[in-house]
């Protein structure tokens, strides 16, 4: 559980072993990291369908060895042009599930096309082949999918089309059962044949929009036709002599950078890992970052986001000086956690750190008719308060929790890391990177060590600090004494999300780690 997988040439990590294996096969067939990443992404949409799918969004953080460029592809969708606050008149918030929550165009399929056109060697049809096979012929359903199905069984069983795919006469499938998605296979075959246009302009787009409109949605075919993701420069900061890269807004990536800037003011050689001091400082630094994030984060096309000020080291020092022994009360808005993070490094040194999501588990719970495509509920995170920075407006991207990360040194990737978890993403990322850079842990150890999550996640109203049962009694008591509302959960609790990481060591070998809390795998050669 604490031993990283070692590769001499290539490494793929993901939250599902079948997706990791598929990515490795694409590399073996002559594809590069970008081809393999798209293959993994598509496979996750099939074998991890409760967490991600064609109806969701994605963010891609890429390193191209030939040009040495670090770039981000923003594969998040915008709200429909007719979706205004007036649509929800009389409501205090956008519904978390159902048609009224499926109000943004899915961006992931577009991102596949963009990444392959920019850097890929293989065709879209080639890299989609493993996903098409898993959808057509089935795969053993994971325990994680069964658990989330059982948790949401009433919702899923009562939703047309969704019930037929994800339940067995109103009950959850059992782990290991063959799970076949023939309608999704047909949709993937259409995309393989006709490309992104099938999803945004052609038959699939028409069928998705028809289903939405027949059930009262304000989304239109023009919303799908208008969708374009874009390449962008990452946001970055230095930590302990390393360059840390994140996706720019509307991603919450800068939250992770601000937190590291705060923590750089602490000497971790004087703080024992796993001690009260370690966890307390990290939690309080994250709370500071969340306050700034929540005040400014939205679509940068609709607001000025003061990244230069927020990522100024002097500002981080001020925040660090405000952290004392007592826990500071803070609030966090409930967010979803249905996310899948994965990463790939190939033999040439190309690297992709990417993440995708439906937002909540099973997204909106709306399957677009006979397409087999489950639609995200990401738009439910918009506010209906006209004065809120993330207020709902037409053709706007919402505050996004997805945040793939990459650490470079000497102009080359050293660590790729990320996690599932919504509000937990910056928390787990901070744990992983401090463990690796400050305490010298390898990826698997950094991921497997006891974790925590503060605040609301998985859509729940919660203001406490949940810690895994492997925290020492002494640490738990000290956290309580300092004012943290501590709840002890399982030793390897799925609530903590599923993380993954790849490290390039000093010899150039690849170390991969996947989360023991789930079904993931690191596969290297």
Curated annotation (Swiss-Prot):
Post-translational modification: Cleaved by autocatalysis into a large and a small subunit.
Catalytic-site annotation from UniProt: 339
GO MF assignments: glutathione hydrolase activity; leukotriene C4 gamma-glutamyl transferase activity
Induction: Positively regulated by TnrA under nitrogen-limited conditions.
Keywords: Acyltransferase, Hydrolase, Protease, Transferase, Zymogen
Catalyses which reaction(s): an N-terminal (5-L-glutamyl)-[peptide] + an alpha-amino acid = 5-L-glutamyl amino acid + an N-terminal L-alpha-aminoacyl-[peptide]; glutathione + H2O = L-cysteinylglycine + L-glutamate; an S-substituted glutathione + H2O = an S-substituted L-cysteinylglycine + L-glutamate
Disrupted-gene phenotype: Grows normally with glutathione as a sulfur source.
Entry EC no(s): 2.3.2.2, 3.4.19.13
GO BP term, pick one: proteolysis
Pfam entry (one): G_glu_transpept
Functional note: Overexpressed protein with an N-terminal His tag has been reported not to hydrolyze glutathione; it is not clear if the construct is processed to 2 subunits.
Note: Is not involved in the utilization of extracellular glutathione as a sulfur source.
Assembly description: This enzyme consists of two polypeptide chains, which are synthesized from a single polypeptide.
Protein family according to the UniProt entry: Belongs to the gamma-glutamyltransferase family.
PANTHER family tied to this protein: GAMMA-GLUTAMYLTRANSPEPTIDASE (AFU_ORTHOLOGUE AFUA_4G13580)
NCBIfam families noted in UniProt: g_glut_trans
Protein name in UniProt: Glutathione hydrolase-like YwrD proenzyme
Organism: Bacillus subtilis (strain 168)
């Amino acid at each position: 559980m604490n031993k990283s997988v070692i590769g001499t040439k290539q490494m793929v990590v993901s939250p599902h072993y079948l997706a990791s294996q598929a990515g490795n096969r694409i590399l073996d067939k002559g594809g590069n990291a970008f081809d393999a990443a798209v293959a993994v992404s598509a496979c996750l949409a099939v074998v991890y369908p409760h967490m991600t799918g064609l109806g969701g969004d994605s963010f891609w953080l890429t390193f191209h060895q030939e040009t040495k460029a670090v770039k981000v592809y923003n594969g998040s969708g915008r709200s429909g042009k007719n979706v205004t606050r007036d649509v929800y008149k009389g409501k205090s918030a956008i519904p978390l599930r159902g048609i009224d929550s499926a109000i943004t165009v899915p961006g992931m399929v577009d991102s596949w096309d963009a990444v392959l056109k920019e850097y890929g060697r293989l065709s879209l049809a080639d890299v989609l082949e493993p996903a098409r096979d898993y959808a057509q012929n089935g795969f053993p359903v994971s325990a994680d999918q069964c658990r989330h199905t059982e948790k949401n069984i009433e919702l899923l069983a009562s939703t047309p089309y969704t019930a037929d795919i994800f339940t067995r006469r109103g009950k959850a499938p059992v782990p290991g059962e063959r799970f076949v998605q023939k309608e999704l296979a047909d949709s993937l075959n259409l995309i393989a044949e006709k490309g992104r246009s099938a999803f945004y302009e052609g038959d699939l787009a028409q069928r998705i929009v028809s289903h939405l409109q027949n059930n009262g949605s304000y989304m239109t075919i023009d919303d799908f036709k208008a969708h374009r993701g874009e390449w962008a420069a990452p946001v970055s900061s230095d930590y302990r002599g390393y360059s840390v890269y994140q996706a720019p807004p509307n991603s919450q990536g800068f939250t992770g950078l601000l937190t590291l800037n705060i923590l750089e003011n602490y000497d971790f050689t004087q703080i024992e890992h796993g001690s009260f001091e370690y966890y307390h400082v990290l939690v309080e630094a994250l709370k500071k970052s969340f306050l700034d994030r929540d005040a400014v984060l939205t679509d940068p096309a609709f607001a000025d986001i003061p990244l230069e000020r927020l990522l100024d080291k002097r500002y981080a020092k001020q925040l660090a000086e405000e952290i004392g022994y007592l826990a500071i009360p803070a609030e966090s808005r409930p967010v979803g956690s249905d996310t899948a993070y994965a990463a790939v490094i190939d033999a040439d040194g190309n690297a992709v750190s990417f993440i995708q999501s439906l937002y909540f588990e099973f997204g909106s719970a709306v399957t677009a008719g006979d397409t087999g495509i489950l639609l995200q509920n990401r738009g439910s995170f918009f506010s209906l308060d006209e004065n809120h920075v993330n207020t709902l407006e037409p053709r706007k991207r919402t505050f996004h929790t997805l945040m793939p990360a990459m650490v470079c040194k000497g102009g080359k990737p050293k660590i790729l890391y990320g996690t599932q978890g919504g509000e937990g993403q910056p928390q787990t990322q901070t744990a992983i990177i401090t463990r690796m850079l400050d305490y010298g842990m390898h990826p698997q150890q950094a991921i497997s060590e006891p974790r925590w999550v503060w605040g609301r996640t998985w859509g729940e109203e919660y203001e406490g600090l949940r810690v895994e049962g492997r925290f020492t009694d002494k640490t738990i008591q000290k956290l309580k004494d300092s004012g943290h509302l501590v709840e002890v959960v399982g030793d390897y609790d799925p609530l903590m999300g599923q993380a993954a990481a790849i490290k390039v060591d000093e010899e150039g070998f690849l170390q991969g780690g996947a989360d023991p809390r789930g079904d993931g795998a690191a596969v290297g050669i």
